Amino acid sequence: MKFTMGRTMKILVAILIVAIIAIVMLSPYSFEKYTASSKMIQVTSTDTVTKDANGKKKQQEYSYKKDDKKYTEIVNDLDQYSYHFTTKTLTNSSQMSDSSKPQMIMLFGNKMLVISDSGEILLDNHVYRMGYSGGKDAKKMMKSINKILKSE
């Protein structure tokens, strides 16, 4: 007995496969699974580079424990954003594109998040993307977090 698929059935199967891949690729994921288990957040940003008395650049690093107000503010800010898969996620690539320039690094315990100005993020050595329209969401989130870091 030979099973053959008709032309219409082949088209329907192809459309179904494309739809499933699109749903997986575009489904938003929350940062909550990283922030919920973390007892401390460490943040380094290109916006927090200062100069010492000798004019030498110094990178500021901020650390906040779970009971700190700024920790809560940063987590609340992260909860407003999401990320989704890219083709690089599916190929298990840990390389951001050449046009992506890392702007902020966040450590949640032993988990690391690197955010670039292009919207690409590196999360646990896998490349994902924030938002669906270039790097707008990533830039907006970094601006908000930098504001928290610089506030008194």
Model segments located where?
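Function-determining sites in protein domains
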Residues: 2-152
